[in-house]
A protein has these predicted regions:
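C-terminal motif of bacterial Sec signal peptides marking the signal peptidase cleavage site
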Residues: 15-19
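Extended ligand-binding regions for polar small-molecule ligands
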Residues: 21-23, 63-72, 150-152, 218-257
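Extracytoplasmic small-molecule ligand-binding "clamshell" domains
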Residues: 24-102
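Short helix-initiation/N-cap motifs at beta->coil->alpha
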Residues: 26, 78-90, 133, 152, ...
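Flexible hinge/capping segments at coil-to-helix
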Residues: 29-31, 128-145
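Hydrophobic/proline-rich hinge and linker segments of small-molecule sensing/allosteric domains
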Residues: 40-43, 115-137, 219-220
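Periplasmic-binding protein-like
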Residues: 121-128, 190, 194-235, 256-261
Length: 261
């Protein structure tokens, strides 16, 4: 009888250990490592976060951060470009493992996605055409028109302030619509607006209001299956922070270090 009990306990322990091992081996991070690549979604046309340079080489803050994370996890970075309004949908359906695209953390997004630690701290700004004296703050958007990327937090922000938002594909189109008077204003990241003005030399735009600091983080599908992936990404970001990689990327594209709150 004693021998039977010992044998039974051993079998139970063996099954339990096997179950635990299977769970670990079958989680998302393990599958990524087995396949050898991390599939990353980003826009590819949102300078300075992700864009093509004069030689059509994909570059930017998010591109370098994404590649740095993949390298530290020990896999290749497979970057897939897409429009903003499809990135988070693609994350939900499994098209991407993660999205690295200057994503800010909102309550609605937290219902569907888990987020890494922040890697950039930006601000959201309100931009109008020079001479637009009746819009001096976000509160003045009530009853006015803005242009923003479809499904973006900037679009949601404009609507929350009472604006009628025209959905467009990218920042350049937003700025063109403001410049030619089709819309009254646009809302976007301070870093992107500053980079656009610096790159184009346009002098007809004025920033009239800005938000508090906005942290950008990396979303992934919510659930236990991604716990180890989130931990690995946070570990990679911490290593990049400690060895100066994050700071160097920020200074390269923003001109200043925006990796600290």
């Amino acid at each position: 009888m004693k021998k039977w009990i010992q044998t039974g306990l051993a079998a139970i322990m063996l099954c339990t250990a096997a179950a635990c091992t299977t769970k670990t081996e079958d989680d998302h991070l393990s599958r990524i490592k087995a396949e050898g690549n991390l599939v990353i979604g980003l826009e590819g046309d949102w300078q300075p976060f992700s864009y093509h340079d004069a030689d059509d080489v994909l570059c930017g803050v998010d591109v370098e951060v994404a590649r740095g994370i993949a390298e530290r996890i020990g896999v290749e970075a497979e970057i897939v470009e897409g429009k903003w309004d499809g990135l988070l949908t693609g994350l939900s359906t499994g098209t991407y493992d993660i999205v690295v695209n200057g994503v800010n953390i909102t309550e609605d997004r937290q219902k569907t996605f888990d987020f890494s630690d922040p890697y950039v701290y930006d601000r959201t700004v309100l931009v109008v055409k020079e001479g637009t004296d009746d819009i001096t703050s976000f509160d003045d958007l009530d009853g006015r028109t803005t242009a923003n990327s479809i499904g973006s937090s900037y679009m949601e922000m404009g609507e929350a302030y009472g604006a009628t938002v025209q959905g467009v594909d990218d920042l350049t189109k937003c700025m063109d619509l403001v410049k030619n008077g089709t819309v009254d204003a646009t809302i976007n990241a301070a870093t992107s607006i500053n980079d656009y003005i610096k790159t184009t030399g346009e002098t007809c735009f004025v920033t009239v209001d800005e938000s508090d600091t906005v942290p950008y983080a990396i979303p992934m599908k919510k659930g236990e299956d991604n716990d180890t992936l989130r931990q690995a990404i946070n570990k990679a970001l911490q290593e990049m922070r400690e060895d100066g990689t994050l700071k160097a990327i920020s200074e390269k594209y923003f001109g200043i270090d925006l990796t600290q709150e």
